Amino acid sequence: MDSFNYTTPDYGHYDDKDTLDLNTPVDKTSNTLRVPDILALVIFAVVFLVGVLGNALVVWVTAFEAKRTINAIWFLNLAVADFLSCLALPILFTSIVQHHHWPFGGAACSILPSLILLNMYASILLLATISADRFLLVFKPIWCQNFRGAGLAWIACAVAWGLALLLTIPSFLYRVVREEYFPPKVLCGVDYSHDKRRERAVAIVRLVLGFLWPLLTLTICYTFILLRTWSRRATRSTKTLKVVVAVVASFFIFWLPYQVTGIMMSFLEPSSPTFLLLKKLDSLCVSFAYINCCINPIIYVVAGQGFQGRLRKSLPSLLRNVLTEESVVRESKSFTRSTVDTMAQKTQAV
């Protein structure tokens, strides 16, 4: 979001009887941060601390396991996407503290705020890849046993990253810096040059490809997976399934406000009261979306073992227990054995 408002400033509150107060800004703006900005700063600080440390730990654990387990490859790429987004938080934090003044230049304006969109597309495409993997494990176990390998997983991740970069291009292209004089500061935002159709097209593509379509397809996918799992009364390998479902659910929860306000602002006039209200909430919506960058390590720890087990085990070993794939392999083999046994029984019956 962060679109520029090109409405003419209102100077109607000035008259020739006004006296100059050196302690008051000439445009009569307050030096106090708005409540949404303060909340955004608190969220940014927490997300940075938890996200950098948590995702760095996940990267460290899964990097050693990625050579032999496919689940580790999935979670490694998710953690890298979240970690890269968290690195931009100190810059965004500084900008909000300075009332959205951007002293970091045009290149940083194009790259750093766009990292959150890159994270959004990379995360949802990786989650879609993971979900397809879970679907095939349940419904095509023999195919998985024959063809599912680390090389194919890395290719799928590379495709997901490539598509994410492609979908983030509009944010890189349309982000510019603009200088204001009342008060004097430099702003970083999206400039569509008064082209509302282009702005709406970008917002619709972001909403459909980054939220609605994945929500529909993943809901259908996991509905079939859960129905099959319950019908078989399977107790093995439910840990990874629960972790993936929790990660998917958290993605849609934390990105919902950003998507809703973004699509609304693209269809509203910049001078409308609703647009101005949403613009004030922009930083808070971005910070809420950023929570998704630190929530995954927390999910992994909670999904580890019972409370006593978490006290007894070190954090790296706990994460390794959650993010490795041993139970998935057992599940695939168990499905394969059950399929072969069923085929053998049918052959004997004939």
Curated annotation (Swiss-Prot):
Domain of life: Eukaryota
Cellular compartments per GO CC: apical part of cell; basolateral plasma membrane; plasma membrane; secretory granule membrane
Keyword ATP-binding on entry: no
Listed name of the protein: C5a anaphylatoxin chemotactic receptor 1
The UniProt record lists the keyword Glycoprotein: yes
Classification via InterPro entries: Anphylx_rcpt_C3a/C5a1-2, Formyl_rcpt-rel, GPCR_Rhodpsn, GPCR_Rhodpsn_7TM
Entry GO MF terms: complement component C5a receptor activity; G protein-coupled receptor activity
Organism, as annotated: Homo sapiens (Human)
Sites of Phosphoserine modification: 314, 317, 327, 332, 334, 338
Assigned protein family: Belongs to the G-protein coupled receptor 1 family.
Extracellular side: 1-37, 94-110, 175-200, 266-282
Chain positions carrying an annotated carbohydrate: 5
GO term, biological process aspect, one: phospholipase C-activating G protein-coupled receptor signaling pathway
Bridged cysteine pairs (disulfide): 109-188
Assembly with partners or alone: Homodimer. May also form higher-order oligomers. Interacts (when phosphorylated) with ARRB1 and ARRB2; the interaction is associated with internalization of C5aR. Interacts (via N-terminal domain) with S.aureus chemotaxis inhibitory protein (CHIPS); the interaction blocks the receptor and may thus inhibit the immune response.
PTMs per UniProt: Sulfation plays a critical role in the association of C5aR with C5a, but no significant role in the ability of the receptor to transduce a signal and mobilize calcium in response to a small a small peptide agonist. Sulfation at Tyr-14 is important for CHIPS binding. Phosphorylated on serine residues in response to C5a binding, resulting in internalization of the receptor and short-term desensitization to the ligand. The key residues involved in this process are Ser-334 and Ser-338.
